[in-house]
Every structure is written in structure tokens, then in C-alpha cells.
From Swiss-Prot:
Keywords on record: Host cytoplasm, Host nucleus, Hydrolase, Phosphoprotein, Protease, Serine protease, Viral capsid assembly, Viral release from host cell
HAMAP family: HSV_SCAF (MF_04008)
Residues carrying the site annotation Cleavage: A247, S248, A610, S611
Name of the protein in question: Capsid scaffolding protein
Pro residues bias locations: 536-574
Region described as Interaction with major capsid protein: spans on this chain: 615-635
Keyword Transferase among UniProt keywords: no
Motif Nuclear localization signal location, chain numbering: 426-429
Amino acid sequence: MAADAPGDRMEEPLPDRAVPIYVAGFLALYDSGDSGELALDPDTVRAALPPDNPLPINVDHRAGCEVGRVLAVVDDPRGPFFVGLIACVQLERVLETAASAAIFERRGPPLSREERLLYLITNYLPSVSLATKRLGGEAHPDRTLFAHVALCAIGRRLGTIVTYDTGLDAAIAPFRHLSPASREGARRLAAEAELALSGRTWAPGVEALTHTLLSTAVNNMMLRDRWSLVAERRRQAGIAGHTYLQASEKFKMWGAEPVSAPARGYKNGAPESTDIPPGSIAAAPQGDRCPIVRQRGVALSPVLPPMNPVPTSGTPAPAPPGDGSYLWIPASHYNQLVAGHAAPQPQPHSAFGFPAAAGSVAYGPHGAGLSQHYPPHVAHQYPGVLFSGPSPLEAQIAALVGAIAADRQAGGQPAAGDPGVRGSGKRRRYEAGPSESYCDQDEPDADYPYYPGEARGAPRGVDSRRAARHSPGTNETITALMGAVTSLQQELAHMRARTSAPYGMYTPVAHYRPQVGEPEPTTTHPALCPPEAVYRPPPHSAPYGPPQGPASHAPTPPYAPAACPPGPPPPPCPSTQTRAPLPTEPAFPPAATGSQPEASNAEAGALVNASSAAHVDVDTARAADLFVSQMMGAR
């Protein structure tokens, strides 16, 4: 690999002295709804405090990556609250050398080394995990229950987001729901424990820290909506006024580059908000450039009046941003266009149930004239797809879609394709008006923004039912079924387009003018009749004869009924009773342990690990695949 450019890394020399960083937060919340071994009740916490042995602070539960010490743990009415000290110069070096200097480009004075470290560790390890000893059936908690505290990306217990700062009071201050007695007790116990440490530092090794930090990133890289989850945990912990979770556009600090923005954000719904100069698109940050804009009822283009209504004021809608070479539409409307484009146009139907030919008239009373381009009257050629009304497969799909939509609405989730309902109350940084300040120190209870630029919102209490309803993996099967139903609808539309007679699968019929006394011709198609079957007209349907007179041209010889050539019988319809079982995937061998094991086998079985890692569920869409195979096989 090529060497990094001089400006890609921090240019200041790295000192040998560690910056003391205080960390504070809740180890658990009593009313969070944690289940199983993760649940901690007030009686258990009171029995475990104060701990007999000092509690170490490590990274991601790695025993060889100890970076600090827990100074104090107090029993708050909301849950156990701790204060710790991190003093590891090797951890600071690893973070500083791995970070690019472009992250901290900003207007105004540059950030100090302490501020850069706080931004890095707060964004990389925003959560904490308490490891407790596993209690047996008859065992009771004692002062050896707590084993250690680990810094991690996302903890399994709710409300375990921590704050980092270089001052003890500044680390505790953001927790607005912490009781005054707990705040004062934590401050007093932490100061006493820090004096006993007398400037101690920890040095687990650069290689061990690098391996552990990389493992943390790999184990959490597929975590869905990581920052939304951090936001929810942050609100549960009652954190407000903490600034070191701020970051912004292009992975730089807020205010890194001047951006020309309209007077009002384009998502506020103002008509003038979409009037953006053409040059502003090229200057916009990469994260904000998106070909599809979701809005709430704002007319983006007058090209599609059914989906994009013109404002009632009568003024023409402003031109969308860009040079005019592409169209900006909502994602839900785009999906409707794609699905509707493949649907065939309805053909005009006659009274007999088949399409009426253009420029032709039906047989009238005896002696009436005939059209020069009248096709043979063969009603049985046209399959049932030409008749109006949904097919049984369409009715099943429509019923399934309606049931899924009703279930989502009953569960409090927005229906698919509804851009007007948001799953969370957060706002993006470009939604804030010019009068809103991100650093308003006059409002101590305000919810300040954090990465990736969420504006403050109204404070909300802890809602365990909402957290349980939006837990990961709840509606993965329903989402997969919705995708399967959409694919079936599109495939059905393509099939209807291909099988629409007489333009799709039937060969063109020659113009024929029957003579008096001739039997009505019949034609067959190999794809529509079974083997050894010939369709003949019913005996009571005798055609009307044309008027007597010389023919304008020589009559075409009548068509002779032809039998369909015998073909292979159709495959039997699979059923649930005769369907072969799905192949069973072989079990994967356990992954090899790295150079830094989390703990020995005996210790791992005796501790309760409260950190979480991203889990890839390979069986998420298996139910949807079975549904698709059954629907396709029953057609």
C-alpha cells in the first residue's frame, strides 16, 4: 500500500503522557424491560454494592485490553450508575494514528488534542456493558456479582450509553434524570478512588488494542440503524447537553465547509424551498446527494398529476433542482411507475367477451352489409384472461397485501411506501431553521445533536413497549413477504402482457369473408388445447349469411379443423404433502479464536456478557421463499 499523504494523518507529535478521560453512565435501567440474565433489580444491585474487588474497564470484554478502572458505582432510583477513569496512552495513539486529519477540518480555531480524543472515543465506543457472574439456582447475589465493565459499540441492556470528558463534573452533568443524592455520591466516591490510584496508567499493548478495536468494528459493521439505536439509548439514559457525539457532512466536523442553503430547508414543505441554484447540487456533500427525494405532499413535477398534485394556489410548481436531465420523484411513486409500466392496456370488449376489432361491425339483421376486415367469429379462441375481473391468484395476492398492511397499521408501523409517517422523531441537520442554534447553553434540558447530525427534539420518557415493538428482527419475515408479493405482482403483469390476445400469443388470422352456406371456420392453437382435442362450433350457432351479389374478390378456402399434435403431459402440480423437504444447510464450524480471546472457557461460562454484536440471519427470507414456491407451483 502506498504511504499516506502528509495531510492524511494528525501532524502534531504524539506525547507520551496519557490524557485522563472520565467515563460515566448507567450500567442498567430498572424499568427498561431487560429479560433473562440481563435483568437487574434494585435488591440485586444493593446486595452487590459496594464491590469487594476493584472493577477493571476493558475494551469489548477482552481480558488483555484493560484501559482503566471503575471509580464509583451508586444505586440510583433509575439504575446502577458508575463513574470510571481511562488512562491509556496506547489507546490514544491507536485512535489518533488511525484517524484522518480531514475528520477535524473546520472553520475557526483548530480543536485541541483532548477534544479530538473525546470525539474519537465517543463515536467509536459510545456504549458500555456490565459483566456479571452467572448465578446458580440457589445462589444469592453478593459483592462479587460485578466482574468488569467493557467499552463497546452497542450494549445489550437498554440505556447504557456513556459520556466521556476530561473533567469529572463534566462527565456526570449530561445525565439530567440522575438524582441529586446519586450525583453527589458518585462525585465524592470517584474523587476518593482517584486519589488512591495516584496517577496510574494502563498499557495492554498496541497490537492487542489494534486487534480488539478492529474486532469491534467487524462485529458491529452490519448492525442495522446503528446511530438510530444510539439515539434511542441516549434518550433512555436521559443524556442532554453532551457535545462530543457531534459530527457532520463528509465525515467532518460541523461547519467544515460553507454550504449555500435556501432560506428554508427543502423538507419543511415550503414551495420556495425547492428553488435551489443549479450550482448548489455540485457543491452539496456526498451524503446529501440523492436522486430520489421523499417529501410530504410537495409537488415536485407537473408531469405526473395523479401522483404529484399541483398546489391549490394556482401558481406553477417550481422547477426541481438539477440541470433538467433527470426527474426527481418520491421512491413510492417510482415503484408504482415501474409496476404499472408492465401492465397491459385494457382492450375494448364486445358484448360476447372478446376484443372488438377496430373498424369492424358485428352481424346485423339479414341483408345488412359486412365490414371488409371482419375476422372469423370464433369465441372459444380467447382465454379467460381477456375477461374483466381479477384472477384467483390476483385475489390471493390482494388479500395478502391487505392483511400485511392491516397488521402493520395495528402494530403502529407505517405502511409500505408511505413517506408521510416517520418511524422516529429525529430531524436531520438541514431541517433546522437559521434561527435554531446547535449550542444553546440557555436550555440545559435540550436534546443536542450528535452524529450524524440529528437535531434536538422534545424529551420523551422510556417506553418499553415501543422499544420491544421496534426490536430488531420483529418484522423481517413480513418485509420479505412484502418483497415476494411485489415480485409476484410484477411477474403477473408481465405474463398478462405476453398472453394478451390477439397480439401476444396468437398468430394473425387472415381476412375472411364467409359465403352463404359455408360452415363457420374454426382454428386452434397448440398452446391452448390439450392433446387429441379439436374445438368445434356448437350446432345451434349458425352464422348469418352475407347479401346475395357478386363477390368483390375470390373467397379464401375455408380453414380445416386441425388436431393439436400430442405433446408431453403437463408436470403434476406440487403440493405440500408431496413436496420434497428443503435442503438442510451444513452447520458451519466455529470460528477460530484470535490472539486475544475474550476469556477462558471456564470464565466465559461463569460470566454474563452484556455486549451485543451484529447477527446475520441467513434464514430471514426462507419463509418468503417457501411462500413464493407454493404460489408459483399452484398456478
